[in-house]
């Protein structure tokens, strides 16, 4: 077994190093003889440890177990309640503790003062500004670092340099923490006033960030960057990340393009050897110099020096260092402000009368026209989604907060909850549900607020609107998004594209006679000036649309939507400030509506069009592309002469002047070679992503457990690694060890082994090899997977009670009755299951399920139940296939150039050999005809799991299913009798398998699975017509080859002679695959 188990046993002897500590390994085997020996071994170990005898004689006696069985878990027993962290920390606390500069930040509470100075008493105290919001403690983090340092203290050569760099940085952290003592966390991993009062307020979150940074140090440059950020972030809790990352927006404009990739007509990336010179006016250098000076003023030395040294020749080779600095800057942690400051931020901008009303007018009209263009077709055709918008809204109702806690009665049970879905049920039950009335959000009913914290930016507020707003906007927004899906201007929504496609779009039109204008409009989106023109544009669009239809239901839908806009033009918010709740008139647009993303994109598109139309009065150019992506927009302009410094300068000044005429405080830049937006940046013709995901601090607390968070931690580590920020893998594994251990009693803990955490089961947390998803096919792996499946679904008494109440049942049947033309058990059950699943976000239900899961897990980790599950998983399919494959060595030349310099070597190598992919593989079934047929007549959206179930039913049943959803019997009959139906069977199976194999996640999303270079390595003689079997054989072969290449940086070729007799068996099995949901899959989903 791999490295994990080795680290696990070393870690246990590191943490529990007293005389009394015992570690008992627990083994299991699928071989019944060996399994008996495993049980004996365990019994004797426990027996010996009770008597205080050594276990080493048993290890000899049961050598067969240790050699041939699989480690299941380690039981660790230790009574000294250890203040071991403090004891070990003293050895590292050799340096001078950091002293915070208490004037570093504008807002008093952002200075790292002693907690009792910021909060006079426990009543006043809040941890919300420094809460790491992660289910692991500062003491565990310190332990993990000290464990690593101890393990590597004897390293030699380059490894020793890494050790010395990290040791040096850890001495800073250790000395500072040791001065005040290690803060102890409570059982919810929070730090209370009593613990913090004599310590600096930001000590914990700073130390977590510092540890995350120092464990990501490898080179000398890393060391310099980390040291500077660790020391300065101790004092500067507000602007450090912004200062350090600001220069990037200019740096991307300084590198000549010498060869790049462009998007061709087929939407594929294709190499182009064009050369484009970076044309940079002096003013740009002055602005950059100013940024560097600001960095120096803030006390930075090495980072600005590195940037200045790079500026000498602006080479692409050394740009990776700039890229590194940009990524590192985010790891100083989140900037968490008080809500009152976050809200007032938008309201501080003075309102001036001196604006260009003509431009505002044009802006509003563009928004109006875009709204009309988006909705014209569905409105004129009286689209069923717009007619049944209320039902669609209910089906998609989220289980997020509705802004207030209410007392609700479900049967005999009375509960308090803030969840939207529960409020809706309650309102319907008591006749309070009035979808035709959108409650006002004025001074009488101010909006409660949520928050969004991001490193390097101010805290933003989020409206928590009543559920009526969600209901009213849902259907219309869906239609807006489906329009955006096939409109290239909307980079974020454009059909199945990914970031690589957007990259090729930009580079495609760059040349000596074009320039690219890129603007960050995040300030504008939340500014007061935007509110009136924005909402009015939408209202005018809706008015025009209402005249295009005679269907009262569609008109009603549009009117409700319009009402949400009218209400929000007069919005008040409630902000807790100390003990009082302030009501403030809030005249700006905030996130929180269903339309936020779509409407912002529309507004940003209108904004850049307005600006371009002004520029066009002065210059003659062709707009080659306009794109909007979230808070950013960019456009490539082609002139009829070569671009000069003078031109870049003038266009830049004109653009900024035009924005200022609208009072838009935005960052507008003009370049000839690259852009930088929030999601990605293009420099020297290559694409880069910011690797800025924090590992040891989280933005907010959700209801995920330690296991979930361990999986999220691993997933974040992988994303950062793909983007060029590499954290020590041993450290990540140590964190996983800590976060997945299960306490049995105070002194007894159970630590799962690698097999448990990496097997594709409901408990999977990480992959034993980065970037490679393995599906275990050995006897022991399948055995443990089956064992886990026996305890996968946990019941919750509270959820059952709610679900059996009249309130709940009535709600579900109301939905079913509105949705279905005739009875349909699959859909009715589906709705009930979905609604019941929404109850999971209600804490008591969640906790109850978790407790059951953990007690089952505890039983399982001490002895796996031999269990014959009749469920088939993807592992079983792959296990059936595997024996028929023969492997031979093969050669594949490197033939593509690099376009994403930050990728790890092995992933880069695979892309260079087989090519990359610019599209998402469809894994939801939405491209199948049955899915399109259903969405033509119904607002119901079946999941890929449901489609997979339905499509394998008998034809008669499929027909009934369709008819019950409102598909005319004629259409349903035609569908089942046509060839389309058998194509669908294959399409849906394909999507389902892709979905199970997470083909759009991790690094698999970068590889071209249909690469001819890859196909060349696979030989499968064609037998009979079972496309599904051919598909799975090919896909398995591709994954095997790619996984091998990632691991070994070399290629294999696969030959498969699959017997015809087995094909039918396999095909039958393929219609019974069970999907497994695990912390690992939800972490992947969470990345989305």
Swiss-Prot record:
Keywords: Magnesium, Nucleotide-binding, Nucleotidyltransferase, RNA-binding, RNA-directed RNA polymerase, Transferase, Viral RNA replication, Virion. It is found in: Virion. Its EC number is 2.7.7.48. Gene3D superfamilies: 1.10.357.80, 1.20.120.1390, 3.30.230.140, 3.30.70.2480, Viral RNA-directed RNA polymerase, 4-helical domain. One of its GO terms (molecular function) is RNA binding. Residues 501-687 form the RdRp catalytic domain. One of its GO terms (cellular component) is virion component. Its cofactor is Mg(2+). Pfam families: RdRP_4, Rotavirus_VP1. It catalyses: RNA(n) + a ribonucleoside 5'-triphosphate = RNA(n+1) + diphosphate. GO terms for biological process: DNA-templated transcription; viral genome replication. SUPFAM superfamilies: DNA/RNA polymerases. Belongs to the reoviridae RNA-directed RNA polymerase family. RNA-directed RNA polymerase that is involved in both transcription and genome replication. Together with VP3 capping enzyme, forms an enzyme complex positioned near the channels situated at each of the five-fold vertices of the core. Following infection, the outermost layer of the virus is lost, leaving a double-layered particle (DLP) made up of the core and VP6 shell. VP1 then catalyzes the transcription of fully conservative plus-strand genomic RNAs that are extruded through the DLP's channels into the cytoplasm where they function as mRNAs for translation of viral proteins. Interacts with VP3 (Potential). Interacts with VP2; this interaction activates VP1. Interacts with NSP5; this interaction is probably necessary for the formation of functional virus factories. Interacts with NSP2; this interaction is weak. This is RNA-directed RNA polymerase. The lineage of its organism: Viruses, Riboviria, Orthornavirae, Duplornaviricota, Resentoviricetes.
């Amino acid at each position: 077994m791999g490295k994990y188990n080795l680290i696990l046993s070393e870690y246990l002897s590191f943490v529990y190093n007293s005389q009394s500590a015992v570690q008992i390994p627990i083994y299991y085997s699928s071989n019944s003889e060996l399994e008996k020996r495993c049980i004996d071994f365990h019994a004797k170990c426990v027996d010996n440890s009770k008597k205080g005898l050594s276990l080493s004689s048993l290890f000899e006696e049961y050598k067969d177990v240790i050699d041939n069985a699989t480690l299941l878990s380690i039981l660790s027993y230790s009574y000294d309640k250890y203040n071991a962290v403090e004891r070990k920390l003293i050895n590292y606390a050799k340096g001078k503790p950091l002293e915070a500069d208490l004037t570093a930040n504008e807002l008093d509470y952002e200075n790292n003062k002693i907690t009792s100075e910021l909060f006079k008493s426990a009543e006043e105290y809040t941890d919300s500004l420094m809460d790491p919001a992660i289910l692991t403690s500062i003491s565990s983090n310190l332990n993990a670092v000290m464990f690593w340092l101890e393990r590597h203290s004897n390293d030699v050569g380059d490894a020793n340099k890494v050790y010395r760099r990290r040791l040096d940085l850890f001495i800073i952290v250790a000395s500072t923490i040791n001065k005040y003592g290690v803060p102890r966390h409570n059982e919810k991993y929070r730090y209370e006033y009593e613990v913090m009062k004599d310590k600096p307020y930001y000590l914990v979150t700073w130390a977590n960030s510092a540890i995350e940074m120092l464990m990501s140090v490898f080179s000398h440059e890393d060391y310099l960057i980390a040291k500077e950020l660790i020391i300065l972030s101790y004092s500067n809790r507000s602007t450090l990340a912004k200062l350090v990352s600001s220069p990037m927006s200019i740096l991307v404009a300084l590198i000549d393009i010498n060869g790049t990739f462009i998007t061709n007509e087929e939407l594929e990336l294709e190499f182009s050897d064009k050369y484009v010179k970076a044309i940079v006016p002096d003013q740009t250098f002055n602005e950059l110099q100013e940024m560097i000076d600001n960095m120096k003023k803030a006390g930075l030395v090495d980072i600005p020096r590195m940037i200045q040294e790079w500026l000498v020749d602006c080479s692409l080779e050394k740009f990776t260092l700039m890229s590194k600095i940009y990524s590192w800057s985010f790891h100083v942690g989140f900037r968490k402000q008080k809500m009152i400051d976050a809200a007032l931020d938008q309201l501080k901008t003075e309102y001036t009368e001196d604006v260009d009303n003509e431009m505002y007018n044009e802006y509003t009209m563009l928004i109006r026209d875009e709204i009309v263009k988006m909705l014209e077709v569905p409105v004129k055709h009286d689209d069923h989604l717009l007619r049944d918008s209320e039902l669609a809204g209910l089906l998609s109702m989220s289980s997020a907060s509705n802004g207030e806690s209410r007392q609700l009665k479900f049967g005999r049970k009375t509960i308090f909850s803030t969840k939207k879905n529960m409020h809706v049920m309650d309102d319907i039950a008591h006749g309070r549900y009035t979808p035709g009335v959108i409650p006002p959000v004025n001074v009488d009913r101010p909006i409660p607020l949520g928050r969004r914290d991001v490193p390097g930016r101010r805290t933003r507020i989020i409206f928590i609107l009543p559920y009526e707003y969600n209901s009213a906007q849902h259907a219309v927004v869906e239609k807006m998004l489906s329009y955006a899906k096939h409109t290239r201007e909307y980079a974020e929504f454009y059909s199945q594209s990914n970031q690589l496609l957007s990259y090729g779009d930009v580079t495609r039109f760059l040349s000596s006679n074009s320039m690219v204008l890129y603007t960050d409009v995040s300030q504008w989106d939340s500014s007061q000036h935007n509110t009136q023109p924005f909402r009015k544009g939408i209202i005018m669009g809706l008015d025009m649309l209402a005249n295009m239809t005679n269907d009262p239901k569609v008109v009603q839908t549009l009117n409700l939507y319009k009402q949400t806009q009218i209400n929000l033009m007069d919005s008040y918010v409630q902000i807790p400030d100390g003990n009082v709740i302030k009501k403030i008139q809030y005249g700006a647009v905030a996130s929180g509506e269903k339309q936020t993303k779509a409407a912002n994109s529309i507004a940003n598109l209108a904004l850049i069009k307005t600006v371009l139309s002004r520029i066009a009065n002065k210059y003659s150019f062709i707009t080659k592309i306009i794109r909007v992506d979230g808070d950013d927009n960019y456009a490539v302009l082609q002139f009829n002469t070569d671009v000069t410094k003078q031109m870049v300068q003038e266009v830049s000044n004109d653009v900024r002047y035009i924005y200022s005429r609208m009072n838009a405080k935005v960052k507008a830049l003009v370049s000839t070679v690259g852009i930088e937006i929030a999601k990605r940046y293009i420099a020297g013709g290559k694409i880069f992503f910011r690797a800025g995901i924090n590992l040891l601090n989280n933005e907010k607390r959700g209801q995920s457990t330690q296991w979930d968070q361990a999986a999220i931690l691993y997933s974040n580590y992988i994303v950062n690694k793909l983007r060029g920020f590499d954290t020590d893998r041993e450290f990540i594994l140590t964190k996983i060890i800590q976060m997945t251990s299960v306490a049995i009693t105070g002194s007894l803990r159970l630590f799962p082994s690698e097999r448990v955490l990496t097997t594709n089961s409901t408990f999977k947390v990480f992959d034993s090899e980065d970037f490679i998803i393995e599906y275990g096919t050995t006897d022991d792996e399948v055995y443990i997977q089956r064992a886990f499946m026996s305890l996968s679904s946990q019941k919750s008494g509270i959820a059952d009670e709610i679900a059996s109440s009249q309130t709940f049942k009535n709600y579900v049947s109301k939905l079913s009755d509105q949705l279905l033309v005739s009875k349909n058990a699959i859909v009715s059950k589906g709705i009930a299951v979905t609604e019941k699943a929404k109850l999971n976000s209600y804490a008591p239900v969640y906790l109850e399920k978790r407790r059951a899961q953990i007690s089952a897990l505890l039983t399982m980790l001490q002895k796996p139940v031999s269990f014959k599950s009749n469920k088939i998983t993807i592992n079983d399919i792959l296990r059936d296939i595997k024996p028929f494959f023969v492997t031979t060595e093969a050669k594949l030349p490197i033939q593509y150039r690099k376009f994403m310099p930050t990728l790890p070597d092995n992933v880069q190598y695979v892309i260079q050999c087989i090519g990359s992919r610019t599209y998402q593989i469809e894994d939801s079934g939405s491209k199948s005809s049955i899915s399109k047929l259903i969405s033509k007549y119904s607002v119901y959206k079946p999941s890929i799991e449901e489609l997979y179930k339905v499509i394998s039913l008998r034809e008669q049943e499929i027909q009934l299913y369709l008819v019950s959803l409102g598909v005319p019997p004629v259409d349903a009959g035609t569908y089942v009798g046509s060839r389309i139906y058998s194509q669908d069977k294959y399409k849906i199976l394909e999507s389902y398998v892709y979905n199970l194999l997470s083909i759009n996640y991790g690094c698999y999303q970068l590889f071209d699975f249909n690469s001819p270079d890859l196909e060349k390595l696979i030989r499968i003689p064609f037998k009979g017509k079972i496309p599904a079997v051919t598909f799975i054989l090919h896909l398995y072969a591709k994954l095997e080859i790619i996984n091998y290449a990632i691991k070994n940086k070399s290629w294999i070729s696969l030959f498969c002679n699959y017997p015809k007799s087995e094909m039918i068996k396999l095909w039958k099995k393929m219609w019974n695959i069970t999907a497994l949901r695990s912390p690992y899959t939800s972490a992947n989903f969470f990345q989305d």
